Amino acid sequence: MADNGTITVEELKQLLEQWNLVIGFIFLAWIMLLQFAYSNRNRFLYIIKLVFLWLLWPVTLACFVLAAVYRINWVTGGIAIAMACIVGLMWLSYFVASFRLFARTRSMWSFNPETNILLNVPLRGTILTRPLMESELVIGAVIIRGHLRMAGHSLGRCDIKDLPKEITVATSRTLSYYKLGASQRVGTDSGFAAYNRYRIGNYKLNTDHSGSNDNIALLVQ
């Protein structure tokens, strides 16, 4: 190490040689999370990705706070304070939107840091909730050998005659209704159907299924 406390090029080279294997594993894990960690592909990797995203917020905020406390000069200190405020406001807005979505859907998927759009499908006496990346005008449902897939998510066994008449897509501000449109059976246990959006408003899910299965939303006063 040099007299002024910095490391030399040779020392940096030796450090990289010693940590190359660890760095390679870190980049491999990052690649796997970015390429394969999707909710409709690998649920285990997706949960790890969500935990990683949750941890990034407090770690990032702590870095900017420490940079402000142990500032190099007043310019970097001011930048660190500004960035800490921005990150804090972004983190707060995430919690506000998540709790609003949770109040609407009562699903823990509301705290997903990747998206605040949730698909809600009433099936077999309960509401199955899955995350969506965007809200579409038409949502397709495909049944292959008795297994239902909707918007890329596997929802379990279902016959085409048992498809719900209505599904919803919830955000922190709105709830969109989708009505079952055209459907077609293929063979004995396969088929496909399309749900068309026909209404959008400030609603919340009705989790009481003692009545009709079609009544799955209540107006938020």
From Swiss-Prot:
Does Chaperone count among this protein's keywords?
no
Xref: InterPro entries: M_CoV, M_SARS-like-CoV
Keywords carried by this UniProt record? Glycoprotein, Host Golgi apparatus, Host membrane, Host-virus interaction, Membrane, Transmembrane, Transmembrane helix, Viral envelope protein, Viral immunoevasion, Viral matrix protein, Virion
Instruction: List where in the cell it is found.
Output: Virion membrane; Host Golgi apparatus membrane
* Location (main, coarse): virion
Matches recorded under CDD domains: SARS-like-CoV_M
What's the protein here called?
Membrane protein
